[in-house]
A protein has these predicted regions:
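A short beta-alpha structural unit
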Residues: 120-130, 141-148, 173-192, 214
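Alpha-helix N-cap and loop-to-helix initiation/capping positions
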Residues: 93-96, 187-190, 242-246
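Zn-dependent metallopeptidase/amidohydrolase metal-coordination segment
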Residues: 136, 202-256
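Short amphipathic alpha-helices in soluble, non-transmembrane regions
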Residues: 154-164
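Midchain, well-structured core segments that form catalytic/ion-binding scaffolds
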Residues: 1-150
């Protein structure tokens, strides 16, 4: 919103899982939602450079430069079936959406590996959610990412095809709903190469994670990213880690880049 990429109206209308709009949540927190909107400070930005820990194992040097942010989408898979008793319903008589979901999760894993992409079912909702009940509905959220838009679209199509075929076999239903799809962000090559030159040939690599830099790039601001090595390759976990020397190297790199850009 501050960058002008998302309108205040759309942002304030967004709801949480309980249906509470952002505007109401802000009011409940004592914040006036009418103050939400583009920031004049963003319009004053000539260039944005973000320093961030690398969130995988792709960087072997202390500091690297980003080439792009992979496109990624989040899709809601709704599997419908027939609720029934877990103890009395014969296995061959079931219309179990959990089984369809489970096979879809395996298909997503396989298809992502074949495409050199990423596919993750990280959130699940089950109805009636009883230990002794065959579910009537399973809702699962897929996070899919790839190096380019075509690969992402083909990945989703392959997963959906296998899920649909499995649903037909299981006597269940499937509905796939895109919830958000972010396009690829290619950082300006001239700016990227300038950073590489300042940093004496630092390695260049893409990232599969979303970043603030992507938003500023979408806002039309020349944007670049610096990464600090992550020896564990782990992110979104307490095990995420970077050596102090690498962190200091990252700070030095950012300072050198900003000094060069200020010339």
């Amino acid at each position: 919103v501050a960058a002008g990429v998302l309108s205040a109206e759309k942002a304030l209308a967004l709801t949480d899982r309980t249906g509470v709009p952002l505007a109401v949540a802000l009011e409940q927190a004592g914040i006036d939602p009418s103050g939400v909107g583009p920031s004049p400070l963003v319009r004053r930005m000539g260039t944005f450079v973000e320093l961030h820990v690398e969130q995988g194992r792709g960087l072997t040097a202390p500091v690297g430069v980003a080439s792009s942010i992979w496109p990624h989408g989040r899709y809601r898979f709704t599997f419908g079936g027939e609720a029934n008793h877990a103890g009395t319903t014969l296995m061959e008589d079931r219309h179990d959406p959990m089984l369809t979901y489970a096979m879809t999760a395996l298909a997503a894993n396989k298809q992502a590996r074949l495409a050199g992409a990423r596919a993750t079912f990280g959130r699940l909702s089950v109805e009636p959610n009883g230990t002794n009940a065959v579910p009537s509905q399973v809702t699962a959220w897929l996070d899919a990412r790839a190096a380019d838009t075509q690969t992402l679209e083909l990945l989703l199509a392959a997963i959906t095809k296998q899920a649909t075929e499995r649903a037909e076999r299981d006597g269940t239903t499937l509905q796939v709903t895109p919830e958000s799809v972010s396009p690829i962000v290619n950082f300006p090559t001239g700016l990227r190469d300038r950073l590489v030159g300042v940093l004496d040939g630092a390695p260049v690599l893409p990232t599969g994670a979303g970043h603030d830099a992507g938003v500023f790039s979408d806002a039309g601001i020349p944007t670049a990213m610096l990464f600090v090595r992550n020896p564990t390759g782990i992110s979104h976990s307490p095990a995420e880690y970077a050596e102090q020397d690498d962190c200091l190297a990252g700070v030095d790199a950012l300072a050198a880049v900003l000094k060069d850009l200020a010339k």
